[in-house]
Regions:
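N-terminal pre-Walker A segment at the start of P-loop NTPase domains
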Residues: 1-6
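Phosphate-binding/switch region of NTP-binding enzymes
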Residues: 23-25, 146-233
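Conserved P-loop NTPase nucleotide-binding/switch module
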Residues: 105-139
Length: 300
């Protein structure tokens, strides 16, 4: 008997999981807002988590722009930029905009290399934990990073993160034929593999042109300035398919295991607990029941 459970695949409706990377001035925030508005058609269904010292407010209700903006939901995330505070902010934003809304994390880079971020956590572990150093501390610090990324990818709303790009300069000819230094973006300021966690990753240049670097949708080869039209096209694509089964307790999509299909997990949890539950939440309930039973035995 096989240890793996194969079944015919059915495409499910999905949520946007996008990363926008670019140098300072590339237009990451405005691009994220335009995509979010294109998806929702309602600025109050867009929540911006701002770590950029209030700069996220600059784009609100801008009628002077070629494509005007409205009044979106907003929260400034102040230091420390710990993964736990990011997670709390994201979950709060989801509760505000709902499952058809968009949560923008601007910027995700602060969770990595700013005050209270993962690099700070790694250094603190190396300094204070016996037997730990800058190398061995990564095992524990990486769990904070993974938990944050997994939360952003699992919440029941669309999510967009922006990331700063490490900057360098190259000499290029300008329109007058003179050689001048030009700022270029390199890798995102985040863990090396972060952009691969998202379904879509785009690099935005100083000319505001966004180029797809990773894509699982229809955007391979995309190279253009981002407008709300892109959000509309993405929504149409994401809405194709059936609604995935979600856990009634944690809200995450219920995934199959090596031995059980989603249908079997849903049927079993409804029979035993009266609601749809993922395997993790079922395990929590079972552990809690065992602890309560043991406590009752000790009382007896």
């Amino acid at each position: 008997m096989s240890d793996f459970n194969f079944g015919e695949v059915t495409r499910e409706k999905s949520k946007l999981r996008m990363a926008l990377c670019g140098v300072s001035g590339a237009g990451k925030t405005l691009s994220a807002l335009y995509i979010a508005y294109g998806i929702t058609g309602d600025w109050k269904k867009v929540a911006l988590i701002d770590t950029e010292h209030g700069r996220g407010k600059f784009y609100a209700d801008r009628q002077d722009l070629e494509i005007p903006t409205g009044k979106y939901m907003y929260c400034e995330l102040e230091p420390p930029y710990s993964p736990d505070r990011y997670i709390s902010a994201v979950k709060s934003a989801v509760s505000v905009v709902g499952e058809d809304g968009v949560v923008i994390v601007d910027s995700f880079s602060h969770a990595w290399n700013n005050e209270g971020g993962v690099l700070d956590i790694k250094s603190e572990i190396a300094k204070t934990r016996p037997g730990k150093n800058d190398y061995t501390a990564w095992d524990e610090a990486g769990k904070y990073q993974n938990n944050l990324v997994n939360t952003i990818l699992a919440v029941n709303a669309h999510t967009i993160v922006t990331m700063r790009a490490k900057m360098a300069y190259a000499m290029e000819l300008n329109d007058k034929g003179k050689t001048v230094p030009v700022k270029i973006g390199l890798a995102p300021v985040q863990r090396d593999d972060t952009e691969y966690e998202f379904d879509i990753a785009m690099n935005i240049g100083r000319d505001h042109i966004a180029v797809t670097s990773k894509d699982t949708t229809f955007l391979d080869g995309f190279a253009s300035v981002i407008t709300p039209e892109l959000g509309k096209e993405l929504k149409d694509w994401l809405d194709k398919g059936v609604n995935p089964e979600r856990c009634s307790d944690c809200g995450k999509v219920i995934r199959p295991t090596d031995t059980r299909t989603v249908a079997q997990i849903v049927e079993g949890s409804q029979k035993c607990y009266g609601r749809k539950l993922c395997i993790n939440c079922v395990s929590k309930i079972v552990r809690q029941q065992k602890q309560e039973a043991k406590a009752n035995e000790n009382k007896g």
